[in-house]
UniProtKB/Swiss-Prot annotation:
NCBIfam families: hemL, PRK00062.1. It catalyses: (S)-4-amino-5-oxopentanoate = 5-aminolevulinate. One of its GO terms (biological process) is protoporphyrinogen IX biosynthetic process. It comes from Salmonella paratyphi C (strain RKS4594). Its main location: cytoplasm. The modification N6-(pyridoxal phosphate)lysine is found at K265. The lineage of its organism: Bacteria, Pseudomonadati, Pseudomonadota, Gammaproteobacteria, Enterobacterales. Pathway: Porphyrin-containing compound metabolism; protoporphyrin-IX biosynthesis; 5-aminolevulinate from L-glutamyl-tRNA(Glu): step 2/2. One of its GO terms (molecular function) is transaminase activity. This is Glutamate-1-semialdehyde 2,1-aminomutase. Its cofactor is pyridoxal 5'-phosphate. It is found in: Cytoplasm. Keywords: Cytoplasm, Isomerase, Porphyrin biosynthesis, Pyridoxal phosphate.
């Protein structure tokens, strides 16, 4: 047995499923998950000593690559002054200034510890501000594991084949209305059925939890218009897309103005950080200035703020997003060309530093139904054969892949060459 197999066997006796987040268990592809010893740049190194070109990037945060010296040094320096104070710090103010400067639609921002906390808190705030209970989300989109959001969710929920999680009371779920991503007709129908009851729409501007599904040109502007028409707030969940699709996020890339924005992943540089923010009048409803309660013992802790501040300063440097886009486009085009050479039907969606691989006869993949029609079994075989080639992709047909600026042209070419060998075997 390999060391990963031994560790996984031991872990399953102590940790449910052997992992602390379900998708890591390789449930969506089968087999034994890799246990990682270290990471550097664009590479992961497992406990058995094998190196992999990494396109998971810790599920999105590692836009600069692993073990970036600026982030590492910032964490070490901050740790020397103490790990957590439970009191305000100057770095929290500097971080808030930086985030609100980079994302102009955020007049104010509140730091939390995860993307789930960010979306959960933003929805509570929207409900409190509007005095309404119902929310709209989209089929196949994932916004964390809060009860009200585990309704027809994406990400790990799709991998497990569960449209709703046990443990979510029907009384909670009834306030969550699920519409079809990229379908404004379904959204208008929901508003017309509940014109005075919907507090907000929450949406991934690029759906990254049913793989990678970009919005159609009219979709996000249409959501903005419907929210304005019916007096609801628009929450854009940029946990995945923020600082990756563009410096100011997908909202800037697609030209839509939300009322609230949720951030995560890149904002922490690899540390557990989330944030939500937006219009000043809405944020003023948050405690302690307003009646909507939200709190967190470790929110804004100095280590996480130092990591995030260092990361965002690096991400804001000129040329970062152009490089991400060029590398991702090269990978997507190369994979499609390699598949076409042997007659394998393949679609690779990509936006900025995100991409999604779909084995499908369809010409486009634009919604949940398109994603579910793809050949998941072929993806499973592709994943394992690529792993043997030293390429680490997301271990699920329903998860996006992530590029970093640490990936080189050689890494991209080696990945395409590996895919060409794998396609020849399929």
């Amino acid at each position: 047995m390999s060391k990963s197999e031994n560790l996984y066997s031991a872990a399953r006796e102590l940790i449910p499923g052997g992992v602390n987040s379900p998708v890591r268990a390789f449930t969506g592809v089968g087999g034994t998950p890799l246990f990682i010893e270290k990471a550097d740049g664009a590479y992961l190194y497992d406990v058995d000593g094998k190196a992999y070109i990494d396109y998971v990037g810790s599920w999105g945060p590692m836009v600069l690559g692993h073990n970036h010296p600026a982030i590492r040094n910032a964490v070490i320096e901050a740790a020397e002054r103490g790990l957590s104070f439970g009191a305000p710090t100057e770095m929290e103010v500097k971080m808030a200034e930086l985030v609100t400067n980079l994302v102009p639609t955020m007049d104010m921002v509140r730091m939390v510890n995860s993307g789930t906390e960010a979306t959960m808190s933003a929805i509570r705030l929207a409900r409190g501000f509007t005095g309404r209970d119902k929310i709209i989300k989209f089929e196949g989109c994932y916004h964390g594991h809060a009860d009200c959001l585990l309704v027809k969710a994406g990400s790990g929920a799709l991998t497990l084949g569960q449209p709703n999680s046990p443990g979510v009371p029907a009384d909670f779920a009834k306030h969550t209305l699920t519409c079809t991503y990229n379908d404004l007709t379904s959204v208008r129908a929901a508003f017309e059925q509940y014109p005075q009851e919907i507090a907000c729409i929450i949406v991934e501007p690029v759906a990254g939890n049913m793989n990678c599904v970009p919005p159609l040109p009219e979709f996000l502007p249409g959501l903005r218009a419907l929210c304005d028409e019916f007096g609801a707030l628009l929450i854009i969940d940029e946990v995945m897309t923020g600082f990756r699709v563009a410096l100011a996020g997908a909202q800037d890339y697609y030209g839509v103005v939300p009322d609230l924005t949720c951030l995560g992943k890149i904002i922490g540089g690899g540390m557990p950080v989330g944030a939500f923010g937006g219009r000043r009048d809405v944020m003023d409803a948050l405690a302690p200035t307003g009646p909507v309660y939200q709190a967190g013992t470790l929110s804004g802790n100095p280590i996480a703020m130092a990591a995030g501040f260092a990361c965002l300063n690096e991400v804001a440097q000129p040329g970062i997003h152009e490089t991400l886009d060029e590398l991702t486009t090269r990978l997507a085009e190369g994979l499609c060309e390699a598949a076409q050479e042997v007659g394998i039907p393949l679609v690779v969606n990509h936006v900025g530093g995100m991409f999604g691989i779909f084995f499908t006869d369809a010409e486009t993949v634009t919604c949940y139904q398109d994603v579910m029609a793809c050949d998941v079994e072929r993806f499973k075989r592709f994943f394992h054969l690529m792993l043997e080639e030293g390429v680490y992709l997301a271990p699920s047909a329903f998860e996006a892949g992530f590029m970093s600026v640490a990936h080189s042209e050689e890494d991209i070419n080696n990945t395409i060459d590996a895919a060409r060998r794998v396609f020849a075997k399929q």
